From Swiss-Prot:
Its EC number is 3.1.11.-. InterPro entries: 5_3_exoribonuclease (IPR027073), Xrn1_helical (IPR041412), Xrn1_N (IPR004859). Belongs to the 5'-3' exonuclease family. One of its GO terms (biological process) is nuclear-transcribed mRNA catabolic process. The keyword Repeat does not apply. GO terms for molecular function: 5'-3' RNA exonuclease activity; RNA binding. Pfam families: XRN_M, XRN_N. PANTHER family: 5'-3' EXORIBONUCLEASE 1, 5'->3' EXORIBONUCLEASE. This is Putative exonuclease 059L. It is an enzyme of class 3 (hydrolase). Keywords: Exonuclease, Hydrolase, Nuclease.
Length: 560
């Protein structure tokens, strides 16, 4: 999902970095003898193929010029798999890579599971009975897709993709989110990628690909061309836009070098990392956005302008022990300096928030905002009684506490480490325990005394089995995606955390689709105990999709 409204803002803010992708320009780039490395996060492709075959979403019959002939039950999943492979095929033909990396979402950190749970509770089966929640690790649907692709990728490499030397495939049994597995691959293969002078192309529409690309290109793979290829959603045809990450880095640097007070030495890495941290604060898949700080009211523009005209960096360097490919080595890393972040949070509270309040006062669209209504009624700024009222509007037991604010700051640090240094360096169990964020003023005060309790530490690669994750994220109407007897647990013994009826939070949203389901917190210890008590009753066949596997490397016979 990424960051709402971000790419629209991005195109307006950095138009020089976005171009229409054409085969002509691609060929011109290939003439430089830089082989292409193509990386695909397949989940977006899988969702599109499912919509196309099962006729929902963008492919509902009402949105089509004519109806397709009926497809009989039992054939449809295979048609989805074929369509996914066809989409991969077309991208390989378009980019002509030397190497290809394909990833499907595996089990995710708990912080991401919370967002996945919200999305799955608001999905509904199609008229034909298709449940898009099956696009989750541990389901029969994704397991069979992985087997299908493994078989057919070998055939494609041998008979059709003659310019491709190697395919790296990570299916849904390999732990980690798809896009993060792609960037873990880049970090792991850094030396070889740099030495080969690969031209890196990442395909996907998620806004957070821009953040991941910026960080990997400024901290690890600094010289290689790196671009994001994404569908042009404004085009009626299947056109692509190319986002030039190297040019984006240069543009951000030029803005800073022109406006920002000089430092000795001037640090390019800090500026890029600071930009990413500021973008995180408008909300993402792991954190609710800071109230009244959003893109559509101009909040991010104001914060960036303040940053580029103010002395100081948000990030700094520290020496830490690394894990993964540099295990045991002590190396410099970038981290957030929360005392340096404090002035920016204070600026949001004192300058950005009043602009949002004024916009809200004058706008005639969108849904009411509880916090803004209280502010306007009291004709006061964001004092403690106002923010407490804001949180109490959702739960009589929900109070803003120092612990909650510190959890939010810990999560910002966690997200930065995850995006900058990968899944091996984060605590997979960490999460922010609320659907609502503290205000900028609360965060500003907290940073003055905040001392992080977490660091860059090695964690187990995966702390969650696929079936356990399904128990945590699936709604009751999708219980059939779990095998016996786990499906019965969901609807009989775990009903407290899996309600059939839910309320939606529309507070301050511009559109209905932005609403967030208000769900009860999960008792993970209770779920884990029941899971451990019943998992041995699952069949051996079902348990095949509840394991962790490793990356598959498929190499061509022909030498390159």
């Amino acid at each position: 999902m990424g960051i709402k409204y971000f790419f629209r803002w991005y195109k307006d803010s950095f138009p020089n970095t976005v171009t229409k992708y054409s085969t002509k320009n691609h060929k011109k780039s290939q003439d430089t003898d830089e082989p292409f490395l193509l990386l695909l996060d397949l989940n977006g492709i899988i969702h599109t193929s499912c919509q196309k075959i099962y006729k929902y979403g963008s492919f509902e019959p009402k949105n089509l010029l004519k109806k397709s002939p009926p497809v009989y039950k039992g054939e449809k999943d295979v048609l989805v798999y074929e369509d996914v492979l066809a989409s991969i095929d077309s991208l390989v033909a378009l980019v002509e890579p030397r190497e290809l990396v394909l990833c499907i979402d595996g089990v995710a950190p708990v912080s991401k599971q919370i967002q996945q749970r919200q999305r799955r509770f608001i999905t509904h089966k199609t008229d034909g009975g298709f449940d898009s929640n099956c696009i989750s690790p541990g389901t029969e649907f994704l397991f069979q897709l992985g087997l299908y692709l493994k078989t057919h990728l070998e055939s494609k490499l041998e008979k059709e993709w003659l310019n491709v030397s190697t395919i790296y495939f990570m299916d849904s049994l390999v732990p980690g989110e798809g896009e993060h597995k792609l960037f873990d691959f880049l970090r792991t293969h850094q030396t070889r990628i740099v030495d080969t002078k690969f031209n890196i192309v990442v395909v996907g529409n998620d806004a957070d690909l821009i953040m991941l690309s910026l960080l990997v290109s400024v901290l690890f793979i600094k010289e290689n061309p790196l671009s994001i290829l994404r569908e042009d959603l404004t085009s009626k045809k299947l056109d692509y836009l190319l986002v030039d990450i190297n040019l984006l880095k240069d543009t951000i640097y030029q803005n800073a070098s022109r406006d920002k007070p000089r430092f000795t030495p001037y640090d390019f890495e800090f500026v890029i990392c600071d930009f990413v941290v500021m973008c995180f604060m408008i909300g993402n898949d792991f954190l609710p956005s800071v109230p009244l700080f959003n893109i559509y009211d101009g909040g991010l523009d104001m914060l960036l302008k303040y940053y580029f005209t103010t002395a100081g960096y948000i990030t700094c360097r520290s020496v830490s022990k690394f894990y993964g490919r540099n295990k045991g080595k002590k190396m410099e890393k970038i981290k957030i300096n929360f005392k340096h972040l404090q002035p920016y949070l204070h600026y949001i509270a004192t300058a950005v928030n009043p602009q949002a309040i004024e916009h809200y006062r004058n706008r005639n669209y969108g849904y009411p905002n509880v916090l803004l209504d209280v502010v306007l009624k009291k004709e006061a700024m964001l004092t403690e009684d106002v923010t407490t009222h804001y949180l109490k509007a959702y739960s009589p037991h929900h109070k803003i506490t120092k612990s909650l604010v510190h959890s939010y700051l810990e999560e910002i640090k966690w997200i930065f480490n995850y995006y900058a240094y990968g899944a091996v360096c984060i605590d997979w169990n960490m999460y922010y325990p609320s659907q609502f964020a503290p205000t900028a003023l609360d965060l500003s005060f907290a940073t003055l005394t905040f001392t992080s309790q977490s660091g860059l530490k090695e964690r187990k690669k995966c702390l969650t089995d696929p079936f356990f994750q399904l128990l945590c994220i699936l709604p009751p109407h999708s219980s059939d995606l779990l095998p016996d007897p786990l499906n019965k647990l969901l609807v009989q013994k775990l009903v407290d955390g899996h309600p059939i009826e839910i309320k939606m939070d529309y507070d301050g949203k511009l559109n209905e689709w932005e609403a967030i389901p208000i769900l009860p917190p999960l008792d993970y210890n209770k779920i884990l105990k029941m899971y451990n008590d019943h998992i041995h009753q699952c069949s051996k066949e079902d348990l095949k999709r509840n394991t962790a596997s490793k990356q598959l490397k498929i190499s061509a016979v022909t030498e390159f």
